[in-house]
Amino acid sequence: MSYKIVALPGDGIGPEILNGSLEILQQLSKEFHFEYELESHDFGGIAIDNHGKPLPDSTLNACKNADAILLGAVGGPKWTDPNNRPEQGLLGIRKALGLFANIRPTTVTNGTSHLSPIKEERVANTDFILVRELTGGIYFGEPKQLSENDALDSLTYTRDEIERIARVGFELAQKRHKKLTSVDKENVLSSSKLWRNVINEVSQSYPDVEVNHLLVDACAMHLITNPSQFDVIVTENLFGDILSDEASVIPGSLGLSPSASFSEQGPRLYEPIHGSAPDIANQDIANPFGMLLSVAMCLRESLNEDKAADKLENVIYQLIKEGKTTRDLNGNYLTSEIFNYVKENL
């Protein structure tokens, strides 16, 4: 079977970290005998320069017909028109593809625990996934109102929205350690009362998965004091936005965190969580690990190449353990050198 992959290098450090990662993907495809077709398209600021908008029709059509999308990074200070921002392309692609679930792994290995700002004994063996609902909640609820003296935001969720994000969480938990933690604010929010009820109902279809409920404030505390207790966390949009940023500091660098966005049946989008870092672009000093780990997620979740994903992840964490890292991880290695080391160790 041949897969269709669309590459969106984007802006800033995006092209250099994605293009190097695509060479790694090609090497893995030869070793593990899988085939794919690759297309590269403009997206974000570069698309504004070349096409007048951040998400050209040609890019969107290619994404709709893909099995997976790999995104480098988007944005930068060059593009200042508030009505035509590079980041609007990301919002557009999420909406067009129905990307409703954001998946954020947080992993700390024996070789990376020294990088964390939290004590090593607290973060040792941390390995969890945070599943955030992307399309509902207070960011999108209606009505919204702003006046000089008062303001209104609406936190709304439907049963269907909660059920579909719950199933993503339970499916991931079934493939991992069979533990799911649902995070809400059930003690004060009506939307969270519905959230908890639906989670409990969906859990009946997954009797092998252990379910726990945590209030969001308690979860925020446990992420710092005992992050290794978690396997899969599932939560709504606002809580997930905050908790995923909190979780991103646990490994010690934004450059170590991949992410994915899932639709119900269409293509999935994979990207590192860091920004475009235009101040270090084209200097061969960008950290490529987040992009490489996003490729590993793509291998596992979209291409069903678990062994290739495992091998790539193992090589990455071994290099970090050996201190072969970029300067943001206190290393002295160039981006190109990291890619060469990955190729050699594969």
Swiss-Prot record:
Keyword Cytoplasm: yes
Binding site for Mg(2+): 217, 241, 245
Compartments where located: Cytoplasm
Keywords: Amino-acid biosynthesis, Branched-chain amino acid biosynthesis, Cytoplasm, Leucine biosynthesis, Magnesium, Manganese, Metal-binding, NAD, Oxidoreductase
GO cellular component, one term: cytosol
Binding sites annotated in the UniProt record for substrate: 94, 104, 132, 217
Domain of life: Bacteria
Note describing how the cofactor binds: Binds 1 Mg(2+) or Mn(2+) ion per subunit.
Pfam families: Iso_dh
Catalytic activity: (2R,3S)-3-isopropylmalate + NAD(+) = 4-methyl-2-oxopentanoate + CO2 + NADH
Keyword Membrane: no
Annotated family: Belongs to the isocitrate and isopropylmalate dehydrogenases family. LeuB type 1 subfamily.
Subunit (UniProt): Homodimer.
Stated name of the protein: 3-isopropylmalate dehydrogenase
Organism: Staphylococcus saprophyticus subsp. saprophyticus (strain ATCC 15305 / DSM 20229 / NCIMB 8711 / NCTC 7292 / S-41)
